């Protein structure tokens, strides 16, 4: 049992404070955001990352509920505590809907706010109803209105791969948001959250002064949990988890970091832990997979198919300009913006001199989740059999026995149904990449450059370095000849580990390994 009451599944700041559950203090960001120039703000973060909680924190702040903030950072910062009328719209319930269903849903959430303000005979169209709500709240309170919109993109995410349906739903949402522009004089503060970044032209047609704080260093830690917050507010829980797992406190911190840390959303961001996985780990006292298994969105899988994503496109470090990943998702040339904004890849490095970023999967949990999600497309529908085989291969490699590892792989592939891509050499490279990526403690790279060419696969274990060259319908001998003729192994001479060369030949008729040759460098 956890030492503290964790707010898993609770996204309401007021409830968390009243029920004395753990709250990671983000109120300094509330003060900073509400005391800066500008009226319209947008924050993009992955699902289950604390966006809704921050939104309800803003709501309690603007409603003047000072008592809820006792002992928090903002208590010493804020002097006025002015109360404003707040309109809060949660669009997360608008998923998987067609045109008529979405229009009814908007009518429903508008009606909830209309009842609060005594509007009994509302307008018909959503934009006119929102305009009337803003006008009524402004006139009855005598103060400017605060509008908070959570998960603004939820109605559109599931159809982002279907252009016609996307255009239809996007027009509905653009119409709904339109009063936010021409009601500016009556608005104190407008804040929208979401996962993805849609272009202002497509959604906020005239709202050209919205400030996107998603990659602003001043708000790097606005969602998620930093290492400093972890150590300061969860120290007792770390010790309890160490006791239960019979490991040291330092080992617990290392495992938490390996599994759930590694997110960066700005150039100079501190390491950010996934809050959902971190709190779930403390609740369950297990280093499990929580965020990924809580629901891989169907839109992501659909888009990966649409863009014909191969595993190495996802589970490999990549250099990119900000415009290549912090970009609108509706017309993206690659899947990178969606992977980044959804939290499946993140910023790992920023090189200021040349203004470019290095992106990669954030941590072990996400890497394993993505790898398993790709198994059906590149190995077999039987994910369990694949992961079990990968585990046995890892045990063989831990014994420095590549012969046994390849025998296990050959036996396993003999049970896998024939694949339509079996006549492409690249298919086998991707298949091996997926299987080896399941060996979580190892590093696997493909198409690694050397002075004389590129190695198909480089596998780095705790003790050894393996160079794999793949051939299709040729021979393992020709694969080994290529390794030796091009001296691939010399590129890795300073690795400090024994190097093993592996030539593998696949048979396109069976989709399996025909033979292999193993040599020490």
Map each language-model feature to its residues.
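Mg2+/Mn2+-dependent nuclease catalytic core
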Residues: 166-171, 472-489
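Structural motif
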Residues: 146, 464-468, 500
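Domain-level recognition of nuclease-like catalytic cores that cleave nucleotide substrates
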Residues: 491, 495-521
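Metal-dependent nuclease catalytic cores in nucleic-acid-processing enzymes
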Residues: 176-183, 337-345, 433-437, 482-502
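Conserved catalytic cores of phosphodiester-cleaving nucleases, focusing on short active-site segments
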Residues: 432, 455-472, 486
């Amino acid at each position: 049992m956890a030492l503290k009451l964790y707010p898993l599944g609770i996204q309401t700041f007021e409830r968390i404070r009243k029920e004395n559950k753990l709250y990671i203090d983000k109120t300094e960001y509330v003060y900073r955001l509400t005391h800066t120039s500008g009226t319209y703000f947008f924050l993009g973060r992955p699902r289950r990352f604390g966006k809704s909680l921050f939104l309800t924190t803003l709501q309690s702040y603007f409603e003047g509920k000072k008592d809820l903030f006792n002992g928090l950072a903002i208590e010493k910062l804020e002097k006025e505590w002015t109360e404003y009328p707040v309109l809060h719209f949660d669009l997360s319930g608008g998923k998987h809907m067609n045109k008529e269903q979405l229009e009814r849903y908007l009518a429903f959430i508008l009606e909830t706010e209309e009842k609060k303000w005594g509007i009994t005979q509302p307008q018909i169209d959503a934009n006119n109803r929102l305009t009337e709500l803003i006008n009524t709240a402004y006139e009855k309170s005598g103060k400017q209105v605060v509008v908070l919109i959570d998960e603004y993109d939820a109605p559109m995410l599931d159809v982002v791969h279907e252009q016609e349906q996307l255009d239809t739903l996007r027009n509905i949402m653009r119409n709904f948001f339109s009063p936010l522009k021409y009601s500016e004089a009556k608005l104190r503060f407008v804040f929208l959250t979401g996962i993805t970044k849609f272009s202002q032209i497509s959604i906020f047609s005239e709202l050209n002064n919205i400030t996107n704080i998603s990659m602003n260093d001043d708000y790097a830690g606005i969602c998620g949990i930093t290492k400093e917050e972890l150590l300061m507010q969860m120290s007792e829980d770390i010790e309890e988890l160490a006791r239960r797992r019979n490991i040291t406190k330092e080992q617990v911190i290392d495992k938490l970091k390996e599994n759930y840390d590694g997110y960066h959303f700005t150039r100079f961001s501190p390491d950010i832990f996934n809050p959902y996985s971190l709190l779930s780990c403390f609740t369950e006292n297990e280093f499990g997979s929580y965020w990924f298994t809580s629901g891989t969105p169907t839109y992501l899988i659909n888009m990966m198919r649409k863009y014909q994503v191969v595993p190495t496109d996802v589970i490999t470090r990549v250099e990119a300009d900000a415009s290549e990943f912090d970009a609108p998702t509706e017309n993206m040339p690659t899947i990178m913006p969606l992977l980044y904004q959804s939290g499946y890849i993140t910023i790992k490095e920023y090189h200021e001199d040349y203004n470019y970023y290095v992106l990669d999967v954030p941590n072990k949990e996400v890497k394993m989740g993505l790898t398993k999600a790709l198994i059906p497309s590149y190995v077999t529908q039987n994910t369990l059999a694949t992961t079990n085989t990968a585990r046995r291969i890892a045990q063989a490699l831990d014994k420095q026995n590549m012969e046994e590892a390849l025998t296990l792989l050959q036996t396993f592939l003999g049970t896998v149904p024939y694949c339509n891509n079996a006549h492409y050499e690249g298919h086998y490279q991707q298949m091996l990449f997926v299987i080896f990526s399941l060996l979580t403690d190892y590093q696997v790279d493909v198409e690694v450059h050397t002075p004389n060419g590129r190695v198909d696969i480089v596998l780095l274990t705790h003790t050894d370095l393996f160079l794999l060259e793949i051939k299709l319908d040729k021979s393992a001998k020709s694969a080994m000849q290529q390794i030796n003729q091009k001296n691939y192994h010399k590129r890795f001479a300073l690795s400090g580990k024994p190097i093993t060369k592996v030539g593998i030949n696949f048979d396109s008729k069976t989709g399996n390994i025909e033979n292999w040759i193993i040599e020490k460098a």
